[in-house]
Amino acid sequence: MSNHKDIWLQCETIIYSQVTLKEKMQAICNLLGSQMPAYDWVGFYLSDVKNKKLYLGPFYGEPTEHTSISYGKGVCGQAAEAQKTFVIDDVAEEKNYIACSIHVKSEIVVPIIKNEIVVGQIDIDSHTPAAFKQEDQQMLEKICRELAIYIE
C-alpha cells in the first residue's frame, strides 16, 4: 500500500507548482488514482455557490454522467450542503446515494472550503468496501485545505 506521507509530499509539490488550478487538480487526480490502489475514481467538483450546484472538473477514471449535482443530492451534494467530509463504507446502505457504477462499494467526499463557503470538493470512489481509513481522510482534507488557497 502506498505511503500517505509520500503521496502528500507529491501532492504538496503539485499544489505549489506554477501551473493552473485545473492542471493542479488533474495532476492530483492522476497521482491519487495511479498510486492509491483502492482509489478507483478520483474527481474534483467545483461549486456554483449562487445556484447551489456542483460541476465536474478534472478526474481520473471512467467518465461519469454525473457532471452536475445539486446541493443535498447524493453524497457529493450532502457534503457540499453540510460543509463536512462524508465517508461511506457501504454505498448500498446509503439512502441518498447516486450510483456511478455498479462496481463502487465505498466513497469519500471532502469539501474544499474557503471563507466558510464550499468552493469545491474531491470525490473518490472505490470498488473495495470500507476502503477509506482515517489516514485517507486526513490526507485528503489536507489536500483540500491547501488547494482552497488557489480557488477564486
Predicted regions and their residues:
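Intrinsically disordered, low-complexity terminal regulatory regions
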Residues: M1-P63
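Sensory-domain boundary capping and coupling elements
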Residues: I113-S126
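Short loop/turn motifs at secondary-structure junctions and domain boundaries
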Residues: M36, A99-V104
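Juxtadomain coupling helices with adjacent low-complexity linkers
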Residues: E12, S126-E152
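Short hydrophobic/aromatic beta-strand element in the GNAT-like acyltransferase core
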Residues: W41, V109, Q121
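Regulatory sensory and allosteric helical modules in signal-transduction proteins
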Residues: S47-K53, G57-A99
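A short, aliphatic-rich beta-strand micro-motif
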Residues: S106-I113
